[in-house]
Amino acid sequence: MHLENRVLSSVLDYASKFYKRMSSLVFFSANSIQVQMNISQSSWIKCRDWMAFALSHHIIMGIYLLILRNFLPQVVPDFEWQHYFMRVFIVHIIYIIISYFIRITRYPPGPPPMAVFGNSPFVNILTPEQTFLEYREIYGPIFTLHLSQPTIILAEYKTIQEALVKNGQQTSGRSSAESFVLFTGDRLNGDGVILAMRQKWKDMRHEISRFMNKWYGAPMDELVLHHTRCLEQELAKIAETKSLIDLRDPLAGAIANVIQQITIGRNYMYQDQEFQTQLRDINAVVKEIMTAEVFFVNCYPWLRYLPEGILRKWTNYKRSGFRLQQWFRTILEEHHVNRHQGDFMSHMIDLQESKQEQFRDLSIILTCGDMWTGGMETTVTTLRWGIIYLLNNPEVQAKCQMEILDVFGNDIPDMGKMNQTPYVRATLSEIQRLANVLPWAIPHKTIEECNIGGYDIPVNTEIIPALGAVLFDPNVFESPKQFKPERFLDEEGKYRVMEEFRPFGLGPRVCLGERIARTELYLIFASLLQNFRFYLNRGDPIPVAERVIGGITAPPKPYATRVEYLGNRLIN
């Protein structure tokens, strides 16, 4: 028996070494097989991946050995378990190894995954774009990370363009993760507009575009300026107190009212309890979706059936999402009785009743939720980052104000003169670049097999177009971590359009709300700087341009500012 134990231990050790050896051949290029322990970041990544891979699979094999050698022999002691299970064990390990390497060779190279966790523990959740850039140095612009499933990361602009434009139709799918299917109920085609796929997505996107064409131009400008004046009146009251204030709620109130007017025909006072409840639910959904509990539910869908309260963050995510759905459902029922002229929900009900399109109530509810959440959260977060950079760079704030006053004087800013304010545009672009409010982007999925970067990508493969990595790519933006609006100006001081600067995405899935967001950002930013100065007194805490865990978006750490009303334009 001692001999058999030694044989079994030798088999275990050999299988582990074989596993690691095979992983080095598959995953590592010739230049990265030798793991060198030095202080460079790329070498640390190679070391930590190698150690994680080796450790995780030793643990798995150890668990197998523990079960085979200690548990089952106690159940049936007379049977020669050692002989039987040594054969089963060897066959099983060989099967695992072969099936694993057959599976991973379907994808581009990447770091070896840990058991259960994949590569998730080694991706910085706050700054994933930095991790993507580090892995790009090792594996190239297209590589595989094992998250809830094998996911292709595209970390270079040309590769992203190839995937989303050249192969735009093939990569236009969305994730079918449990955290999404929970609300859409349709694993094959999704629902709403952000998570919809195939014909369902095309039909809804067409209707949104057709509806929004009525708003673009003067109507949109007037709507944004109306709610900007409401915001200015609120800030003027705050300025009188000369106290520190967190601008998140006033900004959220103004921007939310713009998109609410468009989608459901409603406005709210900033402190309205119903409105505040919806904001809390949106924040919960956006934040909890990136937690470990939701990750595990996506990996192991059966976990969603555990009693509520065991996975608290998953429960909070689910409850908040369904409360939002119910809120929109109540509004939809009201719209069926009392139609609101000119809003998107009424437009969709008209289509339902005319039988031109068969849109379900759930599709309308989810689409309004997509428009509301997407149209508010990212814009609010961008402006919050903007105030931080102005507080830390008062000379930039002063230069923007000078340009705004030169162009508009005491007139209301308008989009027609935007090109006459190149420095303001450059500052906004630099804020968007550094804020990178969607660092994880929204994952795509292949609905057809396609070739990207020379790799054949199987159908139903998730893809993350890491546009955030492009925004911090030193080959594109010199000193990418510095706040430098001048990078968006040419030698003549005119605004410089940079092809790689794509904060709203590209291809068929480009953000539908891009024009709304650009209008909001420019008009609100220009109006506030025309009439207000954001400042701090000596001794006030200086806000740090660092992210806090906010979920799918990247908000800054909470901060406060003082506001001075300049009186350059009447706001009543």
UniProtKB/Swiss-Prot annotation:
Pfam families: p450 (PF00067). It catalyses: 5alpha-cholest-7-en-3-one + 3 reduced [NADPH--hemoprotein reductase] + 3 O2 = (25S)-Delta7-dafachronate + 3 oxidized [NADPH--hemoprotein reductase] + 4 H2O + 4 H(+); cholest-4-en-3-one + 3 reduced [NADPH--hemoprotein reductase] + 3 O2 = (25S)-3-oxocholest-4-en-26-oate + 3 oxidized [NADPH--hemoprotein reductase] + 4 H2O + 4 H(+). It is found in: Membrane. It is a multi-pass membrane protein. Its EC number is 1.14.14.-. One of its GO terms (cellular component) is perinuclear region of cytoplasm. Its main location: membrane. GO terms for molecular function: heme binding; iron ion binding; oxidoreductase activity, acting on paired donors, with incorporation or reduction of molecular oxygen, reduced flavin or flavoprotein as one donor, and incorporation of one atom of oxygen; steroid hydroxylase activity. One of its GO terms (biological process) is dauer larval development. Expressed in the 2 embryonic head hypodermal cells XXXL/R. Keywords: Cholesterol metabolism, Heme, Iron, Lipid metabolism, Membrane, Metal-binding, Monooxygenase, Oxidoreductase, Steroid metabolism, Sterol metabolism, Transmembrane, Transmembrane helix. The chain crosses the membrane at residues 52-72, 84-104. It is an enzyme of class 1 (oxidoreductase). It comes from the Eukaryota. Pathway: Steroid hormone biosynthesis; dafachronic acid biosynthesis. Belongs to the cytochrome P450 family. Dafachronic acids bind directly to the nuclear hormone receptor (NHR) DAF-12, suppressing dauer formation and inducing reproductive growth. In a non-cell autonomous manner, negatively regulates body wall muscle arm extensions to motor neurons probably by preventing daf-12 isoform b activation. This is 3-ketosteroid oxygenase. The lineage of its organism: Eukaryota, Metazoa, Ecdysozoa, Nematoda, Chromadorea.
